[in-house]
């Protein structure tokens, strides 16, 4: 069982983030398995909430340092808005620094306002997620990987991504339906599926 941060009841869109570490430590002492944060680059008033405010990678490092063994997860990294090299290095760093604790959800994002801000096409987000996941696995599993695509060019034997994850891979849990990617694709390409809370009758149909 996991907890989505922040642990707080608040009015409006922006939490105060008061005493979060103490609350997370309490959650760990009660036997919860994990705490999760979200990847929300921009505050959009139309969505009326901003998650835990802080950058997910930095905040998870902060949490992991001040806890003992509770798992730390992102639900989920908005892959189309991030470069695979940055995601690969950040995720692998958490995996190595806090062994067997980091979990990574991946998503296409659901806030159209973010895409023009990053100069990314919203309508291509499902393709971007698929390409991004494949590239992450290459960057994690191979020494001196190469690529020549929309993300840029990395020639043979000129650069490597370090550190590598402990098992040369990090499971990726696909969130939602990723902008049109269906369940068959998720079953084939993802390591798990994270979905939004829904009524039981809806979940049963899935």
Segments predicted by a language model, with ranges:
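Active-site-adjacent structural elements that line small-molecule/cofactor binding pockets in enzymes
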Residues: 1-206
